[in-house]
């Protein structure tokens, strides 16, 4: 790893203390489950050939080790207790408690727990490894005990994520050598990126105390007074922006550029390029919402959302695709939102692309994008280069953990830099609790007026609340956080928290041995998304001209293992040995169905039949592309490990296999097989509408209920975009921010 990085991104448990609260019997059951998921195996069980750059000693170590070894079960319990929904915690603890008893083991495992020796019935941890594996294989497919299946799926994800992302104080994991993974040690950063570009505008509450915070804020040019009776710091400014991502960063820049004093609240921390470690585990923990392990309430979908200065733009995969014409037409005509048919919006897209340095070329593509491009070309399919907010020769597979080279131009490197230069102040480690609302008496038609935000620092050393009073308040926390904040503030519009679109994702994979493929590289090397194939719609009256888009993902070993199907311990270890050459393609759909998020951390969502059909078409096309690119084996992430070896079947059999592929429901569904979906794009949960029946905010982004409260993030988009939405979010935010500037001008008259 890079020698210099931020302590929070370095890895290695600092205090060696676990505080998950699990009993010793529960931990014993958990460790025995972890052992089944990733067991120790004899070397004679190894059936596949190791890769040339991997030593037999490294493979032997990996083959003999187990996920039951300290500290993995404790890490799993820690993640579970701190990051998971309460229902999941209760379910899993009940299962672990039952498995710690003989009667409970009999209820969950049946006759396999019987023994010839006294007391004749074993608890789970006393059963042989072989019998425990048979039990978990039964759980995997059993349609009558789906809660147990869900518990297994949850533990499988956490166990494998913890095992393959755990690092010591030196940033190393001994299993990585066996699977051919390494973290880039590139220390050469551009001179412009060596410093902290936002330093003069940042107040980091994790470094503050009650006695220092007021002085730090005052030194940044803010009007601060102490209300010692109520233990509140009162801050006055022109505009308060909650969130620093694609929407908040743009808003802060535009408003401060118009001469207004802006304060940005960000609950995450600030990291400069030199701070990034490219370590999957510590980076996910610090840079993503809920440490990158945020699941829907039924655990069907895992959601990725940024939680750091720069928000999603700091950790996204660089794709910069303009809003499709068909989408703009739909929003302007079907939703009567004239903004999206104006030259103002088209001009905003150009301004955004120029500010974040979008380029449309790619000098050298990484392995997975080579696979996508070659497969499409061999099939005669159109494949496009994806514009990125980096240079054409940017060859970095670590941008999902923050770009260590400082080339990717997130808001923390662009819009927020402009804002700080214009006097904006960014307060990190500070979470908004509610908007400050009062009854509106000025006859604007809105019942409430927003006066600012009440917030709290997340550092235990700062116990004072912050009451930030402003002329305008902008909510830019993203589609998962803006609705709960508005609802907790007392707003009632029925659209708040509804209409949530996720761009659901399923993956397909193909294995390309180095000895049989002309495509070079490993899946974690090179630009993450540089190519895209659009699966066209055959119906001119369809919801979209494109049924699905096919791109490539960023998959560190922890994410790869978490999403990969588990059939047995042996099969899984063999899959991991093939990790660096197992190319993945993601199928993303423009979902017509929508979910809801009205309480923080609780997302409900279900695909429609229309969406499933589009997903099926995308998955099948992705498999054809992988085969055409030269994969020797292809498959999906369906729970039963659905796959086929390309050279061992006829063309007709291959076609039959591909035609059989379709998306499944989640682990709680009654079917034998199931899927885990992912989502990195959340939109529409506080959508713009022509009236308060159609949306939560108007065409200017202002709440229909509260004067002076604006939304400026992905939540105000009317529908799903259908492509990577960063340019759409920033362009919409740019237009909304300029309208907020106009609002402030009118307010001064």
From Swiss-Prot:
It catalyses: a long-chain primary fatty alcohol + O2 = a long-chain fatty aldehyde + H2O2. One of its GO terms (biological process) is alcohol metabolic process. Keywords: FAD, Flavoprotein, Membrane, Oxidoreductase, Transmembrane, Transmembrane helix. Its EC number is 1.1.3.20. One of its GO terms (molecular function) is long-chain-alcohol oxidase activity. It is found in: Membrane. The chain crosses the membrane at residues 94-114, 144-164. It is a multi-pass membrane protein. Mainly expressed in floral buds and apexes. Detected in roots, stems, leaves, flowers and siliques. It comes from the Eukaryota. Coiled coil: none annotated. Belongs to the GMC oxidoreductase family. The C-terminal part (725-748) is necessary for enzyme activity. This is Long-chain-alcohol oxidase FAO1. It comes from Lotus japonicus.
């Amino acid at each position: 790893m890079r020698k210099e990085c931020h302590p929070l991104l370095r890895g290695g448990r600092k205090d060696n203390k676990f505080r998950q609260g699990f009993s010793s019997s529960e931990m014993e059951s958990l460790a025995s489950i972890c052992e089944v998921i990733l067991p120790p195996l004899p070397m004679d069980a190894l059936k596949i050939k190791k890769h040339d750059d991997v030593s037999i000693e490294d493979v032997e170590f990996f083959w003999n080790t187990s996920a039951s070894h300290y500290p993995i079960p404790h890490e799993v319990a820690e993640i579970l207790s701190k990051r998971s929904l309460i229902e999941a915690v209760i379910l899993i603890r009940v299962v672990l408690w039952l498995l710690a008893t003989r009667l409970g083991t009999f209820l969950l495992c049946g006759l396999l727990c019987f023994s010839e020796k006294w007391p004749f019935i074993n608890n789970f941890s006393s059963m042989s490894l072989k019998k425990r594996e048979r039990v978990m294989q039964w759980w995997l497919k059993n349609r009558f005990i789906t809660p147990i299946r869900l518990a297994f799926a949850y533990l499988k994800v956490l166990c494998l994520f913890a095992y393959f992302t755990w690092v010591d104080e030196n940033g190393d994991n001994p299993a990585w050598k066996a699977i051919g993974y390494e973290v880039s040690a590139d220390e050469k950063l551009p001179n412009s990126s060596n410093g902290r570009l936002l330093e003069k505008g940042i107040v980091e509450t994790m470094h503050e105390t009650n006695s220092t915070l007021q002085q730090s804020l005052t030194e940044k040019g803010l009007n601060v007074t102490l209300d010692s009776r109520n233990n509140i710091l009162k801050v006055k400014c022109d505009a308060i922006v909650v969130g620093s991502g694609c929407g908040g960063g743009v808003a802060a820049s535009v408003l401060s550029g118009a001469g207004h004093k802006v304060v940005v609240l960000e609950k995450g921390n600030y990291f400069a390029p030199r701070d990034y470690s490219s370590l999957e585990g510590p980076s996910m923990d610090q840079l993503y919402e809920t440490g990158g392990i945020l699941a829907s309430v039924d655990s069907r979908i895992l959601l990725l959302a940024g939680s750091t200065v720069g928000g999603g733009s700091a950790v996204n995969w660089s794709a910069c695709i303009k809003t499709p014409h068909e989408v703009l037409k739909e929003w302007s005509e079907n939703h009567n939102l004239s903004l999206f048919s104006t030259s103002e919006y088209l001009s905003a897209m150009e301004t955004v692309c120029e500010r974040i340095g979008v380029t449309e070329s790619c000098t050298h593509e990484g392995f997975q994008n080579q696979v996508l491009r070659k497969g499409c070309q061999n099939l005669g399919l159109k494949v496009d280069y994806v514009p990125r907010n980096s240079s054409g020769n940017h060859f970095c597979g670590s941008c999902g953990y923050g770009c260590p080279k400082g080339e990717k131009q997130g808001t923390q490197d662009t819009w927020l830099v402009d804002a700080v230069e214009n006097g904006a102040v960014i307060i990190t480690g500070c979470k908004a609790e509610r908007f400050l609302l009062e009854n509106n008496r000025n006859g604007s038609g809105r019942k409430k007026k927003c006066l600012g935000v009440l917030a709290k620092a997340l550092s235990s050393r700062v116990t004072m609340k912050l009451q930030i009073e402003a002329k305008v308040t902008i909510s830019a926390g993203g589609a998962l956080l803006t609705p709960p904040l508005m609802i907790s503030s007392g707003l009632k519009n029925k659209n708040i928290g509804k209409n949530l679109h996720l761009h659901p994702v399923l993956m397909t994979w193909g294995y390309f041995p180095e000895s049989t493929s002309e495509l070079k590289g490993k899946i974690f090397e090179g630009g993450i998304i540089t190519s895209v194939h659009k699966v066209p719609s055959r119906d001119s009256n369809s919801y979209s001209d494109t049924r699905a888009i096919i791109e490539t993902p960023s998959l560190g070993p922890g994410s790869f293992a978490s999403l990969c199907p588990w059939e047995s311990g042996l099969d899984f270890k063999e899959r991991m040995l093939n990790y660096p050459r197992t190319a993945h393609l993601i199928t993303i759909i423009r979902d017509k169905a929508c979910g809801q998020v009205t309480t923080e951390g609780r997302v409900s969502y279900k695909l429609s039949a229309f969406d499933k059909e589009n997903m099926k078409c995308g998955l099948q096309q992705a498999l054809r592309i992988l085969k055409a690119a030269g994969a020797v084996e292809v498959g999906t992430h369906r729970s039963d490990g659905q796959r086929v070896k390309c050279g061992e079947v006829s063309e007709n059999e291959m076609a039959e296999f591909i035609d059989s592929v379709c998306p499944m429901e989640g682990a709680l569904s009654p079917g034998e097989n199931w899927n885990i979906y992912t989502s990195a794009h959340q939109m529409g949960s506080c959508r713009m509408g022509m009236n308060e029946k159609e949306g939560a905010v108007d065409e200017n982004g202002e709440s229909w209920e509260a004067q002076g409260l604006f939304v400026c993030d992905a939540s105000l988009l009317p529908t799903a975009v259908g492509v990577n939405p960063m340019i759409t979010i920033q362009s919409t935010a740019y237009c909304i921010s300029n309208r907020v500037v106009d609002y402030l001008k009118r307010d001064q008259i």
